[in-house]
Amino acid sequence: MVISERALKAVLVAVAAYHVATGLLALVAPDTFFDDIGHYGLENSHYVGDVGAFMLAFGVAVGIAVVRPAWRAPILWLGALWYGFHAINHAFDTGEAKSEGRGWGDTLAIALGAAISAWLARVSERLSRG
């Protein structure tokens, strides 16, 4: 499935906004992030903030990629790797989530994020070639 440049930009704006918002939440309200999103194992506000910093940086980079097409594929491939490794990590820790079902649901959602990021990277590469 090929999408237009305009549609890709709209998707990238949404991806950027999600990561900026989630990153800011983890960075400035780590306890809330832990309780509502990342409830795995014992809480460590510093590490939650570290995750927030990375998510925020990724969101900003995707936002820049909206207007700098040369950035798109590399940033999105980075996202695919990050989400892929993140999903593998979650697969080993499903029992530490609020419930086993939540653990596997999170793992699958994160793996889907990896697949979507890889697909968007390929779309970006195709569009850059004309």
Please place each PLM-identified region on the residue numbering.
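Cytosolic juxtamembrane helix and N-cap/initiation of the first transmembrane helix
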Residues: 1-18
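Membrane-helix interface segments
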Residues: 7, 70-74, 100-103
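Hydrophobic transmembrane helix segments
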Residues: 17-48, 52
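Core segments of alpha-helical transmembrane spans in multipass integral membrane proteins
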Residues: 22, 44-66, 81
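Individual transmembrane alpha-helices with interfacial aromatic-anchor signatures
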Residues: 48-53, 100-113
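Hydrophobic alpha-helical membrane segments
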Residues: 75-90, 111-116
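Membrane-helix boundary connector in multi-pass membrane proteins
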Residues: 88-105
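Membrane-water interface at the C-terminal end of transmembrane alpha helices
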Residues: 112-130
